[in-house]
Design a protein with these regions (language model features):
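Residues lining hydrophobic/aromatic ligand-binding pockets adjacent to catalytic sites
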Residues: 1-242
Length: 242
């Protein structure tokens, strides 16, 4: 049990709709992350999907959080959606190195979110494995059901890449997939309404049981951040997992 760590957070921290529920009304937005990091121990940064943060921004994030806080960074859409992993490994490495320079020990790893049109083939599997930088922890979230198979889990495990489980309003399994001995990753997007639906306490209790049975490090992120469902669910799961 001593090696077990659970990191819980949301896919972002700057949600204005949380003001009055999570953030105090008088709290300036520049202090949001510091306040957030006092309540939760991880955040998934989705803004990097659209633009690369400056070193100043990354350093500010690092200084605003405690020693045990972790950031998970989404890989840019130019890599995953526009070029569809038809990239050189150096492109990924350059981005990852830029992020690591600013976040240092606060960097948890990198999330590759792939589009629904990116289906399983042996060629695409190789693209995934060749796109990651093995110097970092890499997680892949697929959006097509063809990736949910044991061969994929096995190949990714051999390369040290984590398969992200997902709760999403699509015909995709919401099972918590554990394909790595040391790391578990799960994203909750809201069901039945994407980004909007709140998970019930009973659903979170089941998830907590799964997390607590895993002896490695778990990363759980709520992306149902339209309004307060995500932050509410994250705080509830934190209590259940303590």
């Amino acid at each position: 049990m001593s090696n077990q760590k659970v990191f819980i957070g949301c896919s972002g921290f700057s949600e204005r709709s949380w003001k009055g529920y999570f953030y105090p009304d008088e709290l300036p937005s520049k202090e949001y992350l510091n306040f957030y990091a006092e309540k939760l121990n991880a955040v998934e940064i989705n803004s990097t999907f659209y633009r690369r943060p400056t070193q100043k921004t990354l350093e500010n994030w690092r200084r605003s959080t405690g020693n045990d806080f972790k950031f998970f960074i989404k890989i840019p859409k130019t890599v995953t959606h526009i070029k569809r992993l038809n990239v050189t490994s150096q492109e990924t490495t350059d981005f990852c190195h830029h992020i690591a320079q600013g976040l240092e020990e606060k960097l948890g790893g990198f999330l590759f979110q792939l589009p629904p049109s990116f289906q399983y083939t042996e060629e695409n599997m190789q693209k995934v494995l060749e796109s990651v930088d093995p110097n970092y922890l890499n997680v892949v979230e697929f959006r097509h059901t063809s990736w949910w198979n044991n061969e994929v889990y096995h190949q990714m495990k051999n390369e040290g890449v984590v398969f992200s489980g997902v709760s999403i309003p699509k015909e995709i399994s919401d099972e918590v997939i554990i394909n790595h001995d040391k790391f578990l990753y799960y994203r909750l997007h809201g069901v039945p309404q994407m980004f909007k639906s709140e998970y019930s306490d009973s659903e979170l209790e089941k998830l907590s049981e799964k997390i607590n049975s895993f002896k490695g490090t778990s990363f759980i992120f709520f992306n149902n951040t339209f309004g307060i469902p995500g932050i509410k669910n994250a705080l509830t799961l934190k209590k259940l997992s303590e």
